[in-house]
Amino acid sequence: MSKLIKGIAASDGVAIAKAYLIVEPDLSYDSNEKVTDIESEVEKFNDAIEASKIELTKIRNNAEAQLGADKAAIFDAHLLVLDDPELIQPIQDKIRNDKVNAATGLDEVTTQFISIFESMDNEYMKERAADIRDVSKRVLAHILGVDLPNPSLINESAVIVGNDLTPSDTAQLNKEFVQGFVTNIGGRTSHSAIMSRSLEIAAVVGTKSITEEVKQGDMIIVDGMSGDVIIDPTEDELIAYQNKRERFFEDKKELQKLRDADTVTVDGVHAELAANIGTPDDLSGVIDNGAQGIGLYRTEFLYMGRDQMPTEEEQFEAYKKVLETMDGKRVVVRTLDIGGDKELPYLDLPKEMNPFLGYRAIRLCLAQPEIFRPQLRALLRASVYGKLNIMFPMVATIKEFRDAKSMLLEEKENLLREGYEVSDDIELGIMVEIPATAALADVFAKEVDFFSIGTNDLIQYTLAADRMSERVSYLYQPYNPSILRLVKQVIEASHKEGKWTGMCGEMAGDQTAVPLLLGLGLDEFSMSATSILKARRQINGLSKNEMAELANRAVECSTQEEVVDLVNQLAK
């Protein structure tokens, strides 16, 4: 008899295969072992560190090849942990001073670090604890000579089942064999969910008990649209879901027919669908999915995975490649957004209690022109190879925009004096991520050429709710009327001055949000490339005038639930 488990739908698709249960390895050891050769234990620890570096570098490179540099960046953080003398030295000292074995020294010191970070009322520090936990587990396995689960060894059709999938696990998934996965924990914005959408495999997360219900090799169905997981399905269920799977793939083929189509509503209003990218490697997905431009090029990934700042020439070549490939379509490049959750090993950033509200993005760039100016020069030089727009992230005041623009104009003059060509048709804009910026949108609109609303941060700053914290996740509300009112305010301010507004957060490609954003007058929707064709089909079936009426009603609602009900009534 089959069993139905409910979870959170994380990635579209239907997977039907045998369960591959990720079993946690036995990493137990004897902490009371008498150690006679202390230096051999230190050497064992050092060897385990080096072996872990080699392993993680391979995993990182595999992740970059399959998923792009932005998804591989998590492993740069893990490699930083393995190179951190503030962690490595205390472990070596522990082994020598307390005369304990390598496993004990590692475990006791990392446990202390993890405990300290987790006790901080700061989600960024808690994420560092997760990095240390993941890395220390790998090092401990090497010390003990134990193999960690390796999904890359799967050589037949399978559905991965586990408590959660670590970044290392997801980076090793082979799309040829892995049809989908199911986890006990996680939500739609968890790392494993985001990775599953990049891999385009079915996923259900947050089932709470899947590992207790499934045995190795059980036949399992994963419905990534509904969040249903069926263990040991009946013959009728297998047939029904095989049909649903076929329909899903047929639908994907149908969507491909829209690749070169216009995005235009039934009443003749055009919308622009653009893609978010992290590196030039992402361009093939942009082209394959019919993007009409790039609405967000995250340049920070040029700076990651290396031990020194990229040169002006390296940056120029990357920007040039993107602009040339897009062949005259608009490319919106975000200047360096480092700090917060993104660190660089060669940049000594101050440790802050809340780095998301601290020294990051445009604040850092204006304070360190030796970092900012080479990027501006590279962008200006590349501008003659396509349609370049530049936007500054995390702008809170009009002075920050003016200072950044002034620096850019200075570098333009310098380049012209040096004999370089620079386009005269570059638009300058800002990310709207801070409520203060949205509140002063009418002031900014007089000076910027465009706005791009970064909803991921705007939502958490407006509702004072960390989107990575499970305890307050109920407050992370994209459809809260307060968010919709801010979005409306920004769009109206830009249109009043003859400017345009885009959106590059997760919300831009959300099927519930699209009708509302269309109704509010959003000009550009920038999203993951894999979401573009679905959004095009949705918009092409909507009336702009009707969506404007819907949006006007939505901003008068009191709660997110009321807004969602309004949109759901539209679908009926």
Curated annotation (Swiss-Prot):
- Residues forming the catalytic site: 191 (tele-phosphohistidine intermediate), 504 (proton donor)
Q: Which residues form the signal peptide?
A: none
Any single Pfam family the record assigns to this protein: PEP-utilizers_C
Its name, as the record gives it, is Phosphoenolpyruvate-protein phosphotransferase
The cofactors required by this protein are:
Mg(2+)
Sorted alphabetically, the Gene Ontology BP terms of this entry are:
phosphoenolpyruvate-dependent sugar phosphotransferase system
- The record lists the organism as Staphylococcus epidermidis (strain ATCC 35984 / DSM 28319 / BCRC 17069 / CCUG 31568 / BM 3577 / RP62A)
Quaternary structure and interacting proteins, as annotated = Homodimer.
- MF annotations from Gene Ontology: kinase activity; metal ion binding; phosphoenolpyruvate-protein phosphotransferase activity
InterPro entries the UniProt entry points to: PEP-util_enz_mobile_dom, PEP-utilizing_PTS_enzyme, PEP_util_AS, PEP_util_C, PEP_util_CS, Phosphohistidine_dom_sf, PTS_EI, PTS_EI-like
Domain note for this entry? Answer: The N-terminal domain contains the HPr binding site, the central domain the pyrophosphate/phosphate carrier histidine, and the C-terminal domain the pyruvate binding site.
User: Where exactly are the transmembrane stretches of this chain?
Assistant: none
Per UniProt, where does Mg(2+) bind? 433, 457
Give the note.
The reaction takes place in three steps, mediated by a phosphocarrier histidine residue located on the surface of the central domain. The two first partial reactions are catalyzed at an active site located on the N-terminal domain, and the third partial reaction is catalyzed at an active site located on the C-terminal domain. For catalytic turnover, the central domain swivels from the concave surface of the N-terminal domain to that of the C-terminal domain.
Which SUPFAM superfamilies does this one have? Enzyme I of the PEP:sugar phosphotransferase system HPr-binding (sub)domain, Phosphoenolpyruvate/pyruvate domain, Phosphohistidine domain
Q: Indicate the family of this protein.
A: Belongs to the PEP-utilizing enzyme family.
